[in-house]
């Protein structure tokens, strides 16, 4: 289901809207002119909108593609916010330039501009 979500989202993270990669971090780092450690933050993961621990099913309607950074940050909290609330939080922080390091925010300024227009 992850790959289907990745395709339907045009390879962009459900939360931050940054481009992701599925299998080749090296190519991603070269294309986007970021370091390999930075590229690894954008590995595509399957994100369950309703967590399995909360009864969420492993089916396409419950899975979106999210970069590993956003996925880990969401689930690293004591209580994971709803996908809608978390997406709003991520977009708000992007608009303020506070989600990724300044270098990544500069590299992907087009994504930030899209977030500001929403």
Model-derived features with residue positions:
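Acidic, metal/cofactor-coordinating or nucleic-acid-engaging core segments within structured domains
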Residues: 78, 89-105
């Amino acid at each position: 289901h992850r790959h289907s979500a990745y395709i339907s989202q045009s390879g962009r993270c459900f939360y931050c809207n940054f481009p992701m990669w599925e299998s080749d971090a090296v190519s991603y780092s070269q294309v986007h002119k970021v370091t390999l450690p930075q590229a690894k933050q954008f590995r595509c993961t399957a994100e369950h909108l309703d967590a399995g621990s909360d009864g969420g099913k492993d089916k396409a309607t419950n899975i979106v593609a999210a970069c590993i950074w956003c996925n880990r940050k969401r689930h690293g909290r004591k209580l994971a916010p709803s996908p809608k609330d978390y997406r709003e939080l991520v977009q708000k922080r992007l608009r303020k330039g506070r989600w990724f390091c300044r270098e990544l925010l500069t590299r992907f300024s087009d994504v930030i501009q899209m977030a500001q227009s929403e």
